[in-house]
Amino acid sequence: MQNPHAPAVHMNTRMFWTPHAWWFGGGFDLNPCIEYAADTAHFHATLETACAAHDPEYYPRFKAWADEYFFIPHRGRARGVGGIFYDDLNTGDWQADFAFTKAVGKTFLPAFLPLAEAHMDQDWNSCDKDAQLIHRGLYAEYNLVYDRGTKLDLTTGHDPEAVLMSLPPLAKW
């Protein structure tokens, strides 16, 4: 996003299948550099509704996990305004776990698109752009230092260009 008022978002889902086990996982978090309380409320309400349709305990459990997972200890703050994170999801009901993971994916547009549309044409200034570049630096710090997937992929021979493609093209500290 070029406009500093339009938030960045991260979302992924995954399924692992080995000869002896399977599980699902995913992460979905909002990373605005200029926070709007109404945007944060909409984002979390949309996620909560999607989670509750599958298990009323999912949203509080996975939100708490996201709050912990996306926290940057050396900064004493989260990289954004939260979301959900889950891993090792295997309730014993593959169909139900797959349905939940698909629902997380289908929640992306209703959770994020209204926020992007509301802010993408908003006026911004050099201070706003500076805030965006600093926040992008925060996002890069998190991904390079703490993200499990990034660390795993870089240490197991994956293509660094593919692994690092989610990093912002410009950042500032």
Positions of the model-derived regions?
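Mature, function-bearing regions of proteins
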Residues: 20, 31-37, 82-85, 90, ...
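Compact, glycine/acidic-enriched structural inserts
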Residues: 20-65
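Short loop/turn segments at secondary-structure transitions that flank enzyme active sites
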Residues: 5, 17-19, 34-36, 90-92, ...
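Long, contiguous binding/interaction regions
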Residues: 5-7, 110, 114, 150-173
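Extended, compositionally biased non-globular segments
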Residues: 93-146, 151
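Internal mixed beta-strand/loop scaffold within catalytic domains of large alpha/beta enzymes
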Residues: 1-24
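A structural signal for the principal folded core domain
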Residues: 66-84, 97-105, 121, 161, ...
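Aromatic/basic-lined ligand-recognition segments
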Residues: 13, 25, 66-92, 137-139, ...
